[in-house]
Amino acid sequence: MAQKMKIVYVDMDNVLVNFQSGIDSITEEERESFKDDLDDVPVIFSKMKPVEGAIEAYQELTRHFEVYILSTAPWNNPSAWPDKLLWVKKYLGGLAYKRLILSHNKHLD
């Protein structure tokens, strides 16, 4: 019988996704308007790029572990949830998309 792989949870923000790249892509007006809550800028998550080396590191982890992506999204940004889902599809593909968990509880065991 094959040994079951251990489960690993990986965060998105500043682990897989370079949050700063999204901030760098918004206008000055948006920065000022959302200065206290930049993650509430509409479609900001769709503008983010991967952290350098993160895609390769994720792929390496999938060779040794059952990898799930565990992230949260702000309640006040209705585009954040679908944008995170589309980001995973775009950069990590089908299996990762099926292993994405969006929750406000990031302390899952």
Describe every region a protein language model picked out.
Residues 3-5, 64, 97:
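A general structural motif
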Residues 10, 48, 70-72, 103-104:
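Short His-Asn-centered micro-motif
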Residues 23-25, 76, 109:
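Flexible, glycine-rich phosphate/dinucleotide-binding loops
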Residues 20-21, 73, 106:
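Short, flexible active-site-adjacent loop segments at beta-strand->alpha-helix junctions, enriched
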Residues 49, 54-88:
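Substrate-recognition element of Asp-dependent hydrolases with the DxDx(T/V) motif
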Residues 1-48:
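Active-site neighborhood of HAD-like aspartate-dependent phosphohydrolases
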Residues 7, 97-109:
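Conserved Lys-Pro-Asp/Glu-containing loop-to-beta segment of HAD-superfamily phosphomonoesterases
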